[in-house]
Structure formats: C-alpha cells, structure tokens
Design a protein with these regions (language model features):
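Short, basic amphipathic alpha-helical segments that act as recognition/interaction helices
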Residues: 30-86, 127-149
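Short Lys/Arg-rich basic patches
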Residues: 1-47, 55, 87-121, 125
C-alpha cells in the first residue's frame, strides 16, 4: 500500500532530486525506445492470463517520490557509520544553487519505505539528541546519499 505525506524540504534537496529525475528519465526514455512497454505488457499477460481480453494501459513516470524510493532502496544496507559519514559529507557539501526557498512536495511512497524512513529518525538520532531527527532531514540525507552514488 502507498501513502501520501507532505514533508517540507530544503531547496537543495529538490536540486538533488531533480538531477536524479533527469538521470532516471533518460534511462526510462532509452528503455521505452527499446520496447519496454511491449515487454511489460507481454510479461503482465503471461503472469496474469485472466487479463486476456482486458485493456491494459501501462504508464511509466519518474517523479520526486520515485527517486526517494530509489535512494532509499539503494542505501537500505547502510550502517550507522555509513550514515554518519554521509551526514558529514552532506554538511560539507557546498550548495552552488541560488535557490534558497524550501518546498513541500506531497510524497507518495510505499508503507515499507515510510516505515524505514521513520525508523531512521530514531536509529540515527545519536546519544546526545533529546528528540528524534526530523523526517525532512532524513529524506534530505537519503536523497544526498542516492545522489552521490
């Protein structure tokens, strides 16, 4: 199941997401030229024969939410030490973008990914923190880690 949640994010987070969207969209466009849609429809009919006689409309879209999911899955096996190093690297990253406004995208993510991000809030908070880390920071960190991969 998927859930919508709105999370206020820093502008640099959108910059990284936009770069990832462009990169992933380029991959998708190449795959579509090579028959991805036809292969997906054939595979779907093979897996679910009852769909024979039913119109199938498949669309593929790269979005802010889909790249958050990509980055989460890419970094899922990170250790706490990996995250600490990534956080330090992110803090030292120099933002060359002039855009300083934040945005509040409505993210549409799988339950398991929301749960994983929320678990990171506690897991990465450190011994000196009195409160859990903000979800916006966790998403920023996950996107940075995926962006630098």
């Amino acid at each position: 199941m998927r859930l919508y949640k709105s999370v206020r994010l820093a502008s640099i987070t959108s910059t990284w997401a936009d770069e990832l969207i462009g990169w992933k969209q380029e991959q998708l466009d190449n795959e579509l030229k090579n028959g991805l849609l036809e292969r997906a429809e054939s595979q779907l009919l093979k897996e679910f024969p009852f769909l024979n006689g039913i119109s199938r409309n498949i669309s593929f879209k790269v979005s802010f939410s889909s790249v958050v999911e990509l980055c989460y899955r890419t970094t899922e096996k990170y250790t706490v030490n990996d995250w600490e190093n990534t956080a330090k690297e992110m803090e030292n990253y120099k933002n060359t973008s002039d855009n300083e406004t934040s945005n509040t995208p409505k993210l549409y993510l799988e339950d398991s990914i929301w749960n994983g991000l929320e678990n990171y809030q506690r897991k990465l908070m450190g011994e000196n923190n009195k409160r859990i880390l903000r979800l916006s920071y966790i998403i920023k960190l996950v996107l940075f880690a995926g962006w630098k991969e």
